[in-house]
């Protein structure tokens, strides 16, 4: 079946769904509308989909640290969220990338690999395709991250490493603290 044959591509569930509903699948040049269609060894399966989106481009300047045909790495400043919200926010990193693509006449997708909180600054990797996003997200646990944090209270050392689980501070949506119920950073 087509759906079994494409498993070798390790497509994300979301991308496979997008291909089935909004894209095109052909087997030996013939368009297929049923993922359960039988295929044989040697059949040529072609998957087509669009990276177009309805993101509103913005003129927010970007601090680009690296770019190639597959990805974009942006230094996100404080006060910016990654994705547009249901309330219609257009001052997000995704909107800024859409604006950059429009100005540079780049036709690519906008797929952030991970998110940083609104007030957290740092590098954000943006894949230019859904397949690239999936491939990079599989290596998520191999990415080294280092955070610099402001702390309050008495500290024995001027600098150091906090290697403890962190979680949200009670009643605060964007403040974090060391806590037994937290997660490893």
Predicted regions span which residues?
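RNA pseudouridine synthases
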Residues: 1-185
């Amino acid at each position: 079946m087509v759906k079994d044959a494409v498993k070798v591509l390790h497509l994300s569930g979301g991308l496979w769904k997008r291909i089935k509903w909004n894209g095109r699948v052909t087997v030996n040049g013939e368009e297929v509308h049923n993922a359960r269609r039988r295929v044989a060894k040697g059949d040529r399966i072609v998957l087509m989909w669009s990276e177009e989106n309805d993101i509103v481009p913005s003129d927010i300047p970007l601090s680009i640290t690296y770019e190639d045909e597959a990805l974009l790495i942006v230094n996100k400043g404080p006060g910016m969220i990654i994705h547009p919200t249901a309330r219609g926010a257009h001052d997000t990193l995704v909107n800024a990338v859409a604006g950059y693509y429009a100005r540079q006449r780049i036709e690519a997708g906008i797929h952030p690999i991970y998110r940083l909180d609104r007030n957290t600054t740092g590098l954000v990797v943006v894949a230019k395709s859904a397949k690239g996003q999936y491939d990079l997200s599989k290596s998520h646990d191999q990415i080294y991250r280092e955070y610099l944090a402001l702390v309050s209270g008495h500290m024995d050392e001027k600098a150091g490493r906090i290697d403890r689980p962190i979680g949200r501070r009670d009643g605060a949506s964007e403040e974090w603290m060391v806590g037994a119920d937290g997660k490893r950073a």
